[in-house]
UniProtKB/Swiss-Prot annotation:
Keywords: Cell cycle, Lipoprotein, Myristate, Phosphoprotein, Tumor suppressor. Myristoylation is required for tumor suppressor activity. Coiled coil: none annotated. It comes from Homo sapiens. GO terms for biological process: cell maturation; inflammatory response; natural killer cell differentiation; negative regulation of interleukin-17 production; neutrophil-mediated killing of gram-negative bacterium; phagocytosis; positive regulation of interleukin-10 production; regulation of mitochondrial membrane potential. Transmembrane segments: none annotated. The lineage of its organism: Eukaryota, Metazoa, Chordata, Craniata, Vertebrata. InterPro entries: FUS1. A lipid is attached at G2 (N-myristoyl glycine). This is Tumor suppressor candidate 2.
């Protein structure tokens, strides 16, 4: 519970290169652990968009269309959610960078 997807799969990009866990290793270890292999920045600059484009090019989280239902001789309008012909928004640039969820840093206010 509380494990991120990459950590659960065994891919921990911010793991320490030193495998020891003794008292001497604790003093020598830095506050921010350097990643093994490729350099992974601790910040996130983009995210996947949660909105969709419809056929007309409108952008929204959900789309509805109005349908007319006749019941007992009375016409009544109902809204039906549209699921077809929607295009995902794609990658969205964030206004200000966020800290990566897998980066092991404790934030506190002084």
């Amino acid at each position: 519970m509380g494990a991120s997807g990459s950590k659960a799969r065994g891919l921990w990009p911010f793991a320490s290169a030193a495998g020891g866990g003794g008292s001497e290793a604790a003093g020598a270890e830095q506050a921010l652990v350097r990643p093994r292999g490729r350099a992974v920045p601790p910040f996130v600059f983009t995210r996947r968009g949660s909105m969709f484009y419809d056929e007309d090019g409108d952008l929204a989280h959900e789309f509805y269309e109005e349908t007319i239902v006749t019941k007992n001789g009375q016409k009544r309008a109902k809204l039906r959610r549209v699921h077809k012909n929607l295009i995902p928004q794609g990658i969205v640039k964030l206004d200000h960078p966020r800290i990566h969820v897998d980066f092991p840093v404790i934030l506190y206010e002084v």
